[in-house]
Amino acid sequence: MLSPVLLLLAQAAAPPPPAGDVIVVGHRAEQELARCLARNCPPAEEVDASLEASVEQFADGRYTDARRTLQTAIRRNRNYAAELPGPVSSLYATLATVAEHEGDTDLWRTAARNNVLVLRRHLGETNLATLREELSFADSLVGLGAPGAANSAYRTIQQRAAGSGHPGIAAGAAFRRAWLALLRDRFKEAQRFADEAVSLAGTDNRLMADLRELLRTRIAIRKGDEGAIEALAARLRQSADVQPQLLFAPPVADINPPPPPFGVHLNPWHDSRIRFADAGYWIRANGQTAEVEVLRTSGLDQWGPGILRQVRERRYVPLDVEPGHPGIYRIDRFTVRGAMDVPTGSHLRQRMGDLTVHVVDLTETDAMREARRRQTAATSAVKGS
């Protein structure tokens, strides 16, 4: 699971989502995919229909169905990657997200890697779409517990992007290096990378300047200044029409059972079930959350209070809106699962280790679809030039 600021920066590079999107889960996309396959539709249509259906299945909590839909689409259409690099790479990117929430770390890593390889091969290493997905892959390495490999990847991306005329990507990579340094309490190094990020983005780039202030605030908090978040929130304002900027989010309370003094502990949660909860909440004008509630849960009753507490204690950049504005409504999916692995003395994969929490913003689903369409159009323009 990405740290909140890495997730924020990944979202900040994307176009803002349409205001007011609310997810309605049904089976329309699955039916469209079935009709598409029945008439032997062209690869471009099949890929798009498969992506739509997988997002629908994921939102409905049917992670296995979503994975199978994507894997089938990849097998049928990967040979069309030269003509459809953006759509085929999106199949892998979406599969990586599903695999993360399913707990299949090998598939998560492989799918995230293949997403990048498709774009490298067919668009080139310095193409903007490729560099964006390189950042996403490095973010996945953080979530997979490989911060050293992620830092090396960020450094390479920063150099490549700066040398090919993509300062925004270079700045994003530099800031991620700053955040990793902060997590290791290397405050001077973190500040240096944050300064590099602002320099690369340009001094008139408000987002990167705000992110640097956020990093400075987190340094102050680590040094004992608990009022730093309130001071920063008082200085910042953002439009209600753009992606909400997260200032602070505590971890979800850990309810993993304590390890036994002797013997092997078998966690009763380590089974094949998918456990998730969808939390709905408002981000008010002052940047605080309100009316936080669990909209739907599947086997996460014990984790419910911790999830609600985590969302209630978040702090976002205050909104620049008229008095009385209700704010922004969001829905987050929380998945709790152990990773799939093969224990010693067995040949069967099963869930092992501590349970971890993985979060994705369901409010972005429609925006993700629209962004994919824009990426496909941009890819077509590059190939046609």
Annotate each predicted stretch with a short phrase.
Residues A14-D139, G143-S385:
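Charge-biased low-complexity segments
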Residues M1-P18:
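Gram-negative bacterial Sec-dependent N-terminal signal peptides
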